[in-house]
Amino acid sequence: MSAGPITLKPLEDSQEAAWDAYVLANPRATFFHRAPWRRVIERAFGHRAHFLLAEQGGRVLGVLPMFHVKSLLFGSALVSTAYGVYGGPVADNAEVLALFHERAEAMARELGVDHVEFRAAEGERPGWKRKEGLYATFRREIGPDNEKNLLAIPRKQRAVVRQSLEKGLVGRVDDDIDLNYDMYALSVRNHGTPVFARSFFHALKKEFGQDCEILNIHKDAEAVAGCLTFYFRDEILPYYAGGTPRAREFGAHDFMYWDLIRRGADRGCRVF
Protein backbone atom coordinates (compact mmCIF):
# COMPACT_ATOMS: atom_id res chain seq x y z
CA MET A 1 0.00 0.00 0.00
CA SER A 2 1.31 3.45 -0.93
CA ALA A 3 2.13 5.85 1.88
CA GLY A 4 0.61 8.65 -0.18
CA PRO A 5 2.11 11.79 -1.71
CA ILE A 6 4.87 13.83 -0.15
CA THR A 7 3.53 17.19 1.01
CA LEU A 8 5.35 20.39 1.91
CA LYS A 9 3.51 22.74 4.23
CA PRO A 10 4.25 25.63 6.58
CA LEU A 11 5.14 24.64 10.12
CA GLU A 12 2.30 25.09 12.61
CA ASP A 13 2.72 25.54 16.36
CA SER A 14 1.19 22.13 17.02
CA GLN A 15 3.91 20.47 14.92
CA GLU A 16 6.94 22.01 16.64
CA ALA A 17 7.59 18.93 18.78
CA ALA A 18 7.59 16.68 15.70
CA TRP A 19 9.86 19.13 13.86
CA ASP A 20 12.41 19.24 16.68
CA ALA A 21 12.26 15.48 17.18
CA TYR A 22 13.22 15.07 13.53
CA VAL A 23 16.03 17.61 13.85
CA LEU A 24 17.46 15.85 16.90
CA ALA A 25 17.31 12.47 15.16
CA ASN A 26 18.77 13.49 11.79
CA PRO A 27 22.61 13.58 11.95
CA ARG A 28 22.73 16.21 9.18
CA ALA A 29 20.57 18.66 11.13
CA THR A 30 22.03 21.34 13.38
CA PHE A 31 20.99 23.55 16.26
CA PHE A 32 20.11 26.20 13.68
CA HIS A 33 17.40 23.97 12.21
CA ARG A 34 15.41 23.97 15.46
CA ALA A 35 11.83 25.24 15.41
CA PRO A 36 12.10 28.01 18.07
CA TRP A 37 14.30 30.07 15.76
CA ARG A 38 11.21 31.24 13.88
CA ARG A 39 9.86 33.06 16.94
CA VAL A 40 13.27 34.35 18.01
CA ILE A 41 14.07 35.98 14.67
CA GLU A 42 10.55 37.23 13.94
CA ARG A 43 10.25 38.90 17.35
CA ALA A 44 13.80 40.25 17.64
CA PHE A 45 14.33 41.39 14.04
CA GLY A 46 10.95 41.34 12.33
CA HIS A 47 12.03 39.00 9.51
CA ARG A 48 9.16 36.76 8.47
CA ALA A 49 9.74 33.04 8.91
CA HIS A 50 8.94 30.47 6.22
CA PHE A 51 9.48 27.06 7.84
CA LEU A 52 8.58 24.15 5.54
CA LEU A 53 7.81 20.66 6.81
CA ALA A 54 7.86 17.64 4.47
CA GLU A 55 5.49 14.81 5.39
CA GLN A 56 4.23 11.56 3.95
CA GLY A 57 1.45 9.66 5.64
CA GLY A 58 1.94 11.66 8.83
CA ARG A 59 5.69 10.94 8.98
CA VAL A 60 8.19 13.79 8.85
CA LEU A 61 10.64 13.40 5.94
CA GLY A 62 12.47 16.71 6.13
CA VAL A 63 12.59 20.32 7.28
CA LEU A 64 13.64 23.64 5.76
CA PRO A 65 13.80 26.76 7.97
CA MET A 66 13.91 30.04 6.00
CA PHE A 67 13.58 33.75 6.72
CA HIS A 68 12.71 36.59 4.37
CA VAL A 69 15.45 39.04 5.31
CA LYS A 70 15.06 42.63 4.13
CA SER A 71 18.05 44.92 4.54
CA LEU A 72 19.05 48.29 3.09
CA LEU A 73 22.63 47.04 3.01
CA PHE A 74 22.19 43.47 1.75
CA GLY A 75 18.90 43.69 -0.12
CA SER A 76 16.09 41.13 0.03
CA ALA A 77 16.81 37.42 0.42
CA LEU A 78 15.47 34.08 1.61
CA VAL A 79 18.04 32.87 4.12
CA SER A 80 18.42 29.54 5.89
CA THR A 81 19.16 30.15 8.63
CA ALA A 82 19.32 33.89 9.29
CA TYR A 83 21.65 34.76 12.20
CA GLY A 84 22.86 31.16 12.21
CA VAL A 85 26.03 29.56 10.88
CA TYR A 86 24.21 26.56 9.40
CA GLY A 87 20.91 25.89 7.68
CA GLY A 88 19.47 24.69 4.41
CA PRO A 89 17.16 21.73 3.83
CA VAL A 90 17.55 18.49 5.75
CA ALA A 91 15.75 15.51 4.23
CA ASP A 92 15.52 11.73 4.27
CA ASN A 93 16.20 11.37 0.56
CA ALA A 94 17.06 13.15 -2.69
CA GLU A 95 13.41 13.39 -3.77
CA VAL A 96 12.44 15.43 -0.72
CA LEU A 97 15.59 17.52 -1.04
CA ALA A 98 14.68 18.39 -4.64
CA LEU A 99 11.15 19.36 -3.58
CA PHE A 100 12.56 21.76 -0.99
CA HIS A 101 14.83 23.37 -3.56
CA GLU A 102 11.97 23.75 -6.03
CA ARG A 103 9.69 25.29 -3.39
CA ALA A 104 12.41 27.70 -2.26
CA GLU A 105 12.96 28.84 -5.85
CA ALA A 106 9.21 29.31 -6.32
CA MET A 107 8.92 31.31 -3.09
CA ALA A 108 11.85 33.46 -4.16
CA ARG A 109 9.99 34.38 -7.35
CA GLU A 110 6.75 35.04 -5.45
CA LEU A 111 8.45 37.26 -2.87
CA GLY A 112 10.67 38.98 -5.43
CA VAL A 113 13.87 38.43 -3.46
CA ASP A 114 17.33 39.03 -4.88
CA HIS A 115 18.62 35.57 -3.99
CA VAL A 116 18.22 32.44 -1.85
CA GLU A 117 21.00 31.57 0.60
CA PHE A 118 21.37 28.12 2.17
CA ARG A 119 24.09 27.93 4.80
CA ALA A 120 24.53 24.23 4.26
CA ALA A 121 27.60 22.01 4.12
CA GLU A 122 25.96 19.56 1.72
CA GLY A 123 22.93 19.01 -0.49
CA GLU A 124 23.85 21.50 -3.20
CA ARG A 125 21.38 22.35 -5.95
CA PRO A 126 22.67 22.03 -9.55
CA GLY A 127 23.00 25.50 -11.03
CA TRP A 128 23.34 27.27 -7.68
CA LYS A 129 26.54 29.15 -6.87
CA ARG A 130 28.72 28.02 -4.00
CA LYS A 131 30.68 30.66 -2.09
CA GLU A 132 34.12 29.35 -1.20
CA GLY A 133 36.31 30.75 1.54
CA LEU A 134 33.59 32.93 3.04
CA TYR A 135 33.06 30.96 6.25
CA ALA A 136 35.26 28.75 8.41
CA THR A 137 34.27 26.09 10.92
CA PHE A 138 36.33 25.36 14.02
CA ARG A 139 35.58 22.08 15.77
CA ARG A 140 37.53 19.79 18.04
CA GLU A 141 36.72 16.66 19.97
CA ILE A 142 36.81 16.62 23.74
CA GLY A 143 36.80 13.65 26.10
CA PRO A 144 35.46 12.88 29.57
CA ASP A 145 38.89 13.45 31.20
CA ASN A 146 39.33 17.18 31.76
CA GLU A 147 43.02 16.87 32.58
CA LYS A 148 43.54 15.46 29.08
CA ASN A 149 41.31 18.18 27.66
CA LEU A 150 43.50 20.79 29.32
CA LEU A 151 46.67 19.19 27.97
CA ALA A 152 45.15 19.25 24.47
CA ILE A 153 45.08 23.06 24.53
CA PRO A 154 48.12 24.60 22.76
CA ARG A 155 50.96 25.28 25.19
CA LYS A 156 50.79 29.09 25.12
CA GLN A 157 47.03 29.22 25.72
CA ARG A 158 47.30 26.48 28.35
CA ALA A 159 49.79 28.62 30.27
CA VAL A 160 47.34 31.54 30.19
CA VAL A 161 44.58 29.27 31.53
CA ARG A 162 46.76 28.11 34.42
CA GLN A 163 47.72 31.70 35.22
CA SER A 164 44.06 32.76 35.19
CA LEU A 165 43.27 29.99 37.66
CA GLU A 166 46.03 31.30 39.91
CA LYS A 167 44.55 34.80 39.62
CA GLY A 168 41.28 33.49 41.03
CA LEU A 169 38.98 33.65 38.01
CA VAL A 170 35.67 31.86 38.49
CA GLY A 171 33.02 30.91 35.95
CA ARG A 172 29.37 31.13 36.98
CA VAL A 173 26.40 29.82 35.04
CA ASP A 174 23.44 32.03 35.81
CA ASP A 175 20.49 33.82 34.25
CA ASP A 176 22.04 37.29 34.29
CA ILE A 177 21.46 37.89 30.60
CA ASP A 178 21.81 41.65 30.92
CA LEU A 179 25.28 41.41 32.46
CA ASN A 180 26.31 39.00 29.70
CA TYR A 181 24.80 41.20 27.01
CA ASP A 182 26.52 44.34 28.29
CA MET A 183 29.95 42.69 27.94
CA TYR A 184 29.09 41.37 24.48
CA ALA A 185 27.82 44.77 23.33
CA LEU A 186 30.90 46.56 24.65
CA SER A 187 33.25 44.20 22.79
CA VAL A 188 31.31 44.29 19.53
CA ARG A 189 30.99 48.08 19.61
CA ASN A 190 34.72 48.48 20.22
CA HIS A 191 35.38 46.39 17.10
CA GLY A 192 33.15 48.69 15.04
CA THR A 193 30.49 46.03 14.46
CA PRO A 194 26.72 46.68 14.78
CA VAL A 195 25.33 45.44 18.09
CA PHE A 196 22.27 43.17 18.19
CA ALA A 197 19.35 44.25 20.35
CA ARG A 198 19.20 43.16 23.98
CA SER A 199 15.80 41.61 23.26
CA PHE A 200 17.53 39.09 20.97
CA PHE A 201 19.49 37.61 23.88
CA HIS A 202 16.39 37.46 26.05
CA ALA A 203 14.45 35.75 23.26
CA LEU A 204 17.19 33.13 22.80
CA LYS A 205 17.17 32.25 26.48
CA LYS A 206 13.38 32.21 26.66
CA GLU A 207 12.94 29.94 23.64
CA PHE A 208 15.84 27.52 24.11
CA GLY A 209 15.89 27.28 27.91
CA GLN A 210 18.58 24.95 29.24
CA ASP A 211 20.00 24.55 25.73
CA CYS A 212 21.02 28.22 25.86
CA GLU A 213 23.43 28.82 28.73
CA ILE A 214 24.83 32.05 30.13
CA LEU A 215 28.39 31.81 31.50
CA ASN A 216 29.88 34.88 33.17
CA ILE A 217 33.51 35.00 34.28
CA HIS A 218 34.30 36.84 37.51
CA LYS A 219 37.38 38.17 39.22
CA ASP A 220 36.19 38.49 42.80
CA ALA A 221 32.96 40.51 42.54
CA GLU A 222 33.76 41.91 39.10
CA ALA A 223 32.46 40.34 35.87
CA VAL A 224 35.19 40.50 33.21
CA ALA A 225 33.94 38.21 30.40
CA GLY A 226 30.94 36.18 29.36
CA CYS A 227 29.57 33.89 26.69
CA LEU A 228 26.12 32.83 25.50
CA THR A 229 26.43 29.19 24.48
CA PHE A 230 24.13 26.70 22.75
CA TYR A 231 24.04 22.97 23.46
CA PHE A 232 22.90 20.51 20.81
CA ARG A 233 23.15 16.74 21.23
CA ASP A 234 26.80 16.20 22.27
CA GLU A 235 28.06 19.54 20.97
CA ILE A 236 28.99 22.82 22.66
CA LEU A 237 28.41 25.92 20.53
CA PRO A 238 29.91 29.10 22.07
CA TYR A 239 28.11 31.80 20.12
CA TYR A 240 28.14 35.34 21.51
CA ALA A 241 31.06 36.35 23.72
CA GLY A 242 32.52 39.53 25.09
CA GLY A 243 34.54 41.05 27.86
CA THR A 244 35.47 44.23 29.69
CA PRO A 245 38.71 46.15 29.14
CA ARG A 246 40.21 44.20 32.05
CA ALA A 247 39.53 40.79 30.49
CA ARG A 248 42.96 40.58 28.86
CA GLU A 249 44.69 41.48 32.12
CA PHE A 250 43.31 38.32 33.71
CA GLY A 251 43.38 36.03 30.66
CA ALA A 252 39.60 35.89 30.97
CA HIS A 253 38.80 34.79 27.42
CA ASP A 254 41.21 31.83 27.47
CA PHE A 255 39.83 30.85 30.87
CA MET A 256 36.27 31.22 29.63
CA TYR A 257 36.73 28.81 26.74
CA TRP A 258 38.50 26.35 29.01
CA ASP A 259 35.64 26.59 31.50
CA LEU A 260 33.17 25.90 28.68
CA ILE A 261 35.15 22.80 27.63
CA ARG A 262 35.31 21.60 31.23
CA ARG A 263 31.62 22.10 31.86
CA GLY A 264 30.67 20.59 28.52
CA ALA A 265 32.75 17.47 29.18
CA ASP A 266 31.09 17.07 32.57
CA ARG A 267 27.75 17.39 30.80
CA GLY A 268 28.64 14.59 28.37
CA CYS A 269 29.51 16.72 25.35
CA ARG A 270 32.14 15.41 22.95
CA VAL A 271 32.48 18.22 20.39
CA PHE A 272 33.54 21.81 21.01
Segments the model singles out, each with a brief description of its role:
Residues 50-52, 62, 87, 102:
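N-terminal, well-ordered alpha-helical segments
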